[in-house]
Amino acid sequence: MIRFISIFIIILSAQAVKAQDTHLLDSTTLTSRLVKDGLDIPWEIIWGPDDHIWCTERYGRVSRIDPMTGQQSVLLDLSGEVFEQSEAGMLGMVLHPDFANNPHVFIAYTYLEGNSILERLVRFEYTGTSLMAVDTLVENIVGNTTHIGCRLIILPDNTMLMSTGDAQNQSLPQNENSVVGKILRMNLDGTIPTDNPNPESLVWSTGHRNAQGIWLAPNGILYSSEHGPTTDDELNILKPNKNYGWPVVAGYCDTPPENAFCEENNVEEPLVAYTPTIAPSDIIWYDHPSIPEFQDKLLMTVLKDRSLIVYTFNEAGDSIITEHKYLKNDFGRLRDVCIAPSGKVYLATNGNSWANNNPFSHSIMELSNEAYVATFATDLEQPEFQVTVFPNPIAQGQTLTIKLAQSQQSNFELYNTTGQLVINEQITGDTKLDLDVEAGIYYYRFVSEDGMMKSESLVVE
């Protein structure tokens, strides 16, 4: 059971004051706030375990961004190595799910070798202030200026999926000897899992044109968004050893030639196909009560149609019951989305055109329901997890007081703005800690015995 805990801390920071606007959904009014502007197409945004937004920019930069202040800490600059043109550049990124013990970051990007545009997937290690390349997992993937794919996701079995586009070569998605136009599955060291459809190949599914969204929902289903040509953008369910039709089939199997191909080639039809096209980008599952219109639904950021699509599924998760479009034209083209544990939604914008005519003019926006008040979900046998931390702000060398209700036990973790763990204490009931740390903004996290978590900011003056 997930429990949501409110700890109210006011931090006065001039940097945190941004222009705000409101957006009406059905019955919920969302407040938007500019988190960070001046970005060069934020292609991937991830809510990190340090409560920062991790971001790739297409021209070749990776940063951690403080969602409260917008402060950007550059971890990696490969702009001299990354090939950026049209849709190519630094694209997908994923963090190791056990980041505290394995601070690995996986990043996919395009590069030039002679006159050839290629893709590679590299594993980096987070040092606390930067990213250091460790291994190249896959390289020499045929690329192009468009149709790159490059969305990454790590599954519960510690294997990783990577989407590759057709690289404008329609002969490759149906060629099982090519990794182009596919969903690839690999171990986290780049080796081939023995239970892949072909244990000698990374290929997990075939017939993809340009899949740019992959998400594993709580129901265990892998959903994927994919760009069609001039018709038939798709939302799919990904399955191993399935063929998704391209280039013979776009959208549904609904013509005689397509029907014949689908029957012979194990084609999986999409849940929905869009004509005219909408240009779907990334997807994510929203499971927080603060925005009822989004709760327990799949969100899709949309580029061409400049909106956020919200899907409700049947109980089995294999059929769409309702589809709603929100935020139409409010932020322009929407490239990516991530969600904070508080339920706040963060959107990466992509300007008003598919061409990057205005570099370093893109942004990350925050959406929140300011009317929402978190409540406790408890049972009679389980006491509420209540905690008070004071003073905040706190002076250097001063004692921090932590009060846990009913002598509960919890782990207290304090991180600096680079994500380094500076304090890790097991506490019970009332605890006093002497803070021997430098002045600055820190982030603390409580993890209780029954898995309840809460993180907030702490200012040391």
Explain the meaning of each model-derived region.
Residues 119-128, 176-188, 238-239, 362-368:
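Beta-propeller blade signature
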Residues 320-341:
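Conserved blade-ending motifs and adjacent loop-strand segments that build the rim/top face
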Residues 1-21, 377:
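Bacterial Sec-dependent N-terminal signal peptides
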Residues 20-170, 216, 221-224, 228, ...:
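Acidic, Gly/Ser/Thr-rich repeat motifs that build Ca2+-stabilized beta-propeller blades
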Residues 368-376:
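Short, compositionally biased serine/threonine- and acidic-rich segments at solvent-exposed termini, linkers
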Residues 33-36, 72-79, 132-139, 194-202, ...:
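Beta-propeller fold detector
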Residues 381-390, 394-461:
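C-terminal outer-membrane/trafficking sorting elements
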Residues 20-30, 130, 191-197, 251-265:
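Blade/loop signatures of beta-propeller domains
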